[in-house]
Amino acid sequence: MISSKASDYQQRIGYVFTDPSLLLQALRHCSAGTPHNERLEFLGDSVVNLLIAEALFQRWPRADEGALTRARSELVRETSLASIARTMQLGEQLILGPGELKSGGHRRDSILADAVEAVIAAIYLDADLATCRTVVLPWFETALTALPVGKPEKDPKTRLQEWLQARQWSLPVYELIFESGDPHTKHFRVSCTLGELKLRTEGEGSSRRLAEQDAASHAINQLDSNK
């Protein structure tokens, strides 16, 4: 039986479920027992990538593969999905275990992003791809419109790599300094070393990839400040 709170939330996301149990599963973090949302998250990751790729393909008829790929990565990255979750007040609806609830899991980017993917999968399973497209794409409209057409900004690692390659210098070396937290609340610290420049920066994030991007961003900032 779906709660009145969850029932009201369906109006906020713009879709009323035929099978409300799918929404409840999408909102249940693994710390709260089963059935939780990890399988839905897996499916939702593929669905949202398809929807965004399709939207970009149609909107940017002259963009090359690289530009389309970078734009999609920008739109479906963890921080972007977490921003959508906050706009929809998704964190308030999450079903968390006592530990996650106490540690503020409903505010954590990784948990929010995973929940968005799970909700997308739930809509897809409850209806079909066409309905999912109609419901979900408006969530991304502001971010889609804000992207510079055909030329989305490259991520920090790509920008740093291209800057070094243009000068025929060695590529940066990323090393894990430490990781902490349980499997669902990981925190990573990574270093980025530029040999020829004797420059070393550090970055943090909820995944190693995000920590590397953060470290690369700090390196770019230092290079810019030394110009």
UniProtKB/Swiss-Prot annotation:
The RNase III domain, residue ranges: 6-128
Which cofactors is this protein said to need?
A: Mg(2+)
Q: Which residues form a coiled coil?
A: none
Q: What Gene Ontology molecular-function terms does this entry list?
A: double-stranded RNA binding; metal ion binding; ribonuclease III activity; rRNA binding
| Entry EC no(s) | 3.1.26.3
Chief localisation class: cytoplasm
A single GO cellular-component term from the record reads: cytoplasm
The family database entries (Pfam families) matched by this protein are listed as: dsrm, Ribonucleas_3_3
Where Mg(2+) binds, per the record, is at 41, 114, 117
What EC class is this?
hydrolase
Tell me which residues make up the DRBM domain: 155-225
Please, one GO biological process term?
rRNA processing
UniProt-annotated catalytic positions: 45, 117
Specify residue ranges for compositional bias: Basic and acidic residues: 203-212
- Protein's job: Digests double-stranded RNA. Involved in the processing of primary rRNA transcript to yield the immediate precursors to the large and small rRNAs (23S and 16S). Processes some mRNAs, and tRNAs when they are encoded in the rRNA operon. Processes pre-crRNA and tracrRNA of type II CRISPR loci if present in the organism.
Share what the entry says about its subunit structure, partners included.
Homodimer.
User: Which family does the UniProt entry place this protein in?
Assistant: Belongs to the ribonuclease III family.
Instruction: Report what the protein is called.
Output: Ribonuclease 3
Organism in which the protein naturally occurs: Xylella fastidiosa (strain M12)
